[in-house]
Amino acid sequence: DRLRSWKNSVVSKLTAGLGQLTRQRNVDYLQGRASLVDARTVVVTMTDGSIREVPFDAGILATGSRPARLAALSSEHDRILDSTSALDVNQVPGRLLVIGGGYIGLEIGSVYAALGAAVTVVEMTSTLLPGADADLVRVLSRRFGSVAAAIYLDTKVTRITADDEAVTVRLDGPDVASGDQRFDQVLVAVGRVPNSEISGLDQTAVDVDPRGFVGVDAQRRT
């Protein structure tokens, strides 16, 4: 509870600071849902229900990203966490499975391990932190291996189901015992996807690829 309260206080300070900066810079801040009418006009449905039309000469698409879903996950459950909900749990799970050996999964997993959870990490590639410098990965693997209950590389999650008692997971990998494994909670950390489903974006010449990424040039212009 103390750690979660501290996290919430940090978030509150950051958002309050951004609000102060917008006022100091005379930024007109609108809170609502935006829809593009064309390449020079956006309509905002405000939180109070009113409508604002905002013309512009140039716009910045900064809608952020969200945690990617796992293909083997058929439904949502409170016992299945992402990188956002993992920072807001009420108690530390006894057994935590981290799906994804990237920096997000390892960072959050190491926190839970320090808090007393038995953390198991599953990564579908042959190494933790895919794409990172191999020398750094070796050091991190030794360090994380000393606190993790288990690390399974070259391993995929083929099935995952959750109920009020636990999360049942089936893994497919060279070092995994056959059969299902049960965990108190599961953290899905398999990357992030862009929030590019912007209403009216198809009314512009902006190019969006099949994965949802906006096409830009070397100067990040659409």
Residue spans of the language-model regions?
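Phosphate-coordination loops involved in phosphoryl transfer and adenosine-cofactor binding
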Residues: Q31, A39, F56, H77, ...
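FAD-site-proximal beta/loop scaffold in flavoenzymes
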Residues: E76-V92, Q181, Q185-T222
